[in-house]
Amino acid sequence: MKGGGIINKFNNKLGFILTAVGSAVGMANVWGFPYKLQEGGLIFLIFYLLFIALFSYVGLSSEFAIGRAADAGTVGSYEKAYEKYNRRVGTIVSIPPLIGLILLTIGYSVVIAYIFKALVDSLTGRIMTSDINIWYRDLSERAYSVWAYHLIIIILTALTTIGSAKTLEKSSKFMMPIFFLFFVIITLVIMTLDGASDGYRYMFRLDLSKLSISTLVSAMGQAFFSLSITGSAMMICGAYLKKDEDIVHSSKITGLLDTVASMVAALVMIPSVIVFDMENAQGPGLLFQILPTVLKNIPGGRLIAIILYTAVLFAGITSLQIMIEVVVESLNYKLKNLNRKITLVLLSAFIFIIGINMEEIKIWGPFMDIISIYIIPISAVIGAISWFYVLDKKTLVDEINQGAKKTYGDTWYWIGKYFYTPLVVIICILTIII
């Protein structure tokens, strides 16, 4: 595929949904959601489910719709939105979301290299015999500590992205079912631990003191980021979707499976922390310090560690695939004579060269904070405003109804324009100022 007009499409609805879920499921599910659920309990969960339903219904479906309408990824989607003014304006508007995604891809590749290192050390048994604090410091505080793992991840991701929609679909159909299966297996093991029931009771406790604006905002932000509605990534999934597929229904299924992924992660993480009276944590500390410590102290911990890090690795790779695919497609869309394979190789080399210089967590952490606090929320606002305030209403609604089993009209559009988009702006402002 060169330039606009995507030829490769997903073979079927399952391939599309699993690829979209693969893009959405990532570290926000694995280490963000469990932490916030443990903090907020049932009140947080209720708010979260309401926002997932809303954001899937209008936010996710709008990004899928503009991608399919434009038959293109990020750049082409913005050009489509602004074509009644000037497509060049759309090109300019697409630059911040695209740059944000490139930077996110670089940072994301680092944490996936961490995960791959943890998996290898689980296979060799090193993670079970080492002092976890020393092991983690060696992993995160030493320059170029995971460069070899980093290189392998970049190569594997490039190989599974090389065939565009076809290889993305095949790899997602393989990796995402394994992700869910492995987490279910681990959940069943965790349930057998003495005290696990206390963890689940705490996890689903009804604490009315959590009925607050802060819990509401926390749930809203978590739902938003969990679905990867960033104004950049999900349009490519829509571009690869056939015209006879129901976008809104597929968006609902994607949101449901993303929620299942978050819940199974929480069912593993929270009881583990409670049973062993570990300090509540989120981010790398949960995955690379607390969980290894827990796994060292339970029967079959090494095997569970292998299963766990394999599942998380697969979730990370499927997200990284879409990020890289978005950038490759956008470059090929504008530079029509640029060979796709050459683009993929050059981009992969760029991500690796920049990424290996960020493997120390003191560099990686602030870098990812800047992206997640400032760049991604602003990009999401740009996207929401572009779809609901700039793009012609008829174009968006017609695309939503293409292949739909029921007709969506003014109500769907009104919710997107006057409810969803203001919420995205609120999330952006609160993320920046809090």
Regions found by a protein language model. Name each.
Residues M27-G40, L156-E169, L188-R201, L208-I213, ...:
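Transmembrane helix-loop junctions in multi-pass membrane proteins
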Residues K2, V111-E141, Y240-E245, H249, ...:
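Helix-loop-helix connectors at the membrane interface of multi-pass transporters/channels
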Residues V93-L98, V328, K334-S348, D369-C428, ...:
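C-terminal membrane-solvent junction of multi-pass transporters and transport-like membrane proteins
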Residues F10, L14, E169, K173-I317:
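Membrane-embedded translocation segments of transport machinery
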Residues M1-W31, G59-F64, R68-I92, K242-D246, ...:
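Membrane-interface "cap" regions at the ends of multi-pass membrane proteins
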Residues P34-Y48, G67-D71, T167-M175, H249, ...:
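Transmembrane helix-loop boundary segments of multi-pass membrane transporters
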Residues I6, P34-E39, T74-P96, S109-A165, ...:
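Inter-helical loop and helix-membrane interface segments of multi-pass membrane transporters/permeases
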Residues L14-I17, S23, V146-A148, L257-M263, ...:
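Loop-to-transmembrane helix boundary motifs in multi-pass membrane proteins
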